[in-house]
Amino acid sequence: MALLQTSLIWVVYAIAIAVLIAVASVFIYVYQTPRDRSPSVTLTCIFAITTLLATVLLLPVDVALVSSTNSSALGRRKDWATDHEVNKILFSLKVVYYLLYSLDALLCLLVIPFTYFWYEEYDEVAAEEGEQTTGNRFWAAFKYTITFIAIVIVLFLVGFFVPVAKDNHSGGLDYFKKLLTENRGERALTFALGLLITIGLCLYVLYTSTGLALLPVSLIKTAPSISAPNLKATTAMQLDSNRERQRQLEGRCGGNTELLSSKDRRELDMLVREERTLIRRQRLADEAQGEGRSWLMRAWLKTEAVFRPFKLLGGIILLIIALVIWVSMLLTAIDKATNSFCKYHCGYILGHITVFNPINWVFVQAAKVFPVDYVIFTLLVLLFFCSSVVGIAIVGIRFLWIRIFQIRKGHTSPQALLLTTAMLMLTILALNYSVSMVVAPQYATFGPQTFCDRTTGTFGEQADCSNARHLIKPCSEMIKNPAASGVCTPSIASTFLNRVTINFPFFGVIFFWGQFVFLGVYLIVVVASLFRSPKLDERQMDEDAEEAEEEGLLASTGRRLDTAWQDITGRSNRQRDS
């Protein structure tokens, strides 16, 4: 029975990974520009996003496996859950976590930078002429990646030798004493994880909070579309007015623009440019309404119009969910600030939850029927992931408030896609801490595990609460009953994260106060967005229309050149045959 249960849990995780591959593939396909696709960039981004999401979604598997050893109805371990069996489960989880975290670090710090420089070093002309070989390109990309290799080495060396916190503020609790690691290898990995979460926290605060606030509002208050009839009518009126003014100016000079004054010539040139822009807008409006397009596209546009009210309903539901998440995070943050037994000395670890958290309660109840909690957790992670993408798309990739790259559907360059992937990886690492320690701390640590708060007379014997159900209590780190340590098994994920904050308290302080900054940024953005009406970005629309026109001209020119070349080669062949 135990083997069947654990096998089913891992099967659900495998199905989730397959779903993640599909989600990552769709994300990359939707955002990358069609005319500048690179297989190496596409595969790297898909693999990196899948790996990191798989790391986060390992948490419900972790909770389900450790909870499977405990009978929450009786508050005791199941008969098959001997120390040997429990240690086997914990060891397998540790191996998977170490593998995924190491892979995440390598992808973010080495593979993505190398792929970036590999793409940058490509010279199409030199490659066609044979001047650039694969070896030359590899060495050029590797030379730039050496800097990142040095960063990784320095990072692990610092983590290897940096002093850890001493056992002065653990309150004498065995659970927290065990987290003070003396293994230098684990210390280096713990330090590296803490540093990456700290960097990701900055991105998480800026982008995820913004996206979480704007994603529901964008569904509720949709910006005007180019396909709207009133915008099309306005464009037609502006075009008629433009052409009428051109006729007036041309009538003054009888068709000879040299007779016009310099002011009128400048105005006429401006009107001609504006006319081209308005014609492009009109063509985009016609295409958006389905004119001149296939019946399938017209059917899709009509279906989209029919389901528009459901889009509004979905936005309202997402807004309510986001507000509940915000309230849950605020309640846990206040609980940590007031009831943490060691405060800043251990990164505000909360030994026992005293304030009700609605999201945490939902997860603990759902965890009793696996995989209900897994489905809810996956949806929660995907909500945060989509919010991060929306935040990056709206804010853009910036350096000192200067936008370097813009992330847009169908217009994202390979370089921007790689940078976005690296940012998402760091953001999701910070999300892993936030979900585990703030959004649902009880669920992420012990899940639905309980213990019988009754002393036993015999060493190794489990307490029996079958006739005293009121003594069955949820597991927590601050349990004073020594018998509970043999019943309650904390998740590996919570152990890793608590080890970071226990060994390096300054990381824990940054993580904790970063949650308040996240909550503040979310509140400011959501209030501002509710009072601000969305507008159509005409400049961006004109750039898209101009780009589409250029691509159409290039395609038609290429077809004409191909036809002319075929005609020439065909005539020469006929002359040889004759």
Swiss-Prot record:
Role of this protein: Probable lysosomal cobalamin transporter. Required to export cobalamin from lysosomes allowing its conversion to cofactors.
Native source organism of the sequence: Aspergillus terreus (strain NIH 2624 / FGSC A1156)
Record's subcellular location: Lysosome membrane
Primary residence: membrane
GO cellular component, one term: vacuolar membrane
Name under which the protein is recorded: Probable lysosomal cobalamin transporter
Topology within the bilayer: Multi-pass membrane protein
Glycan-bearing residues: N70, N168
Position of the signal peptide: none
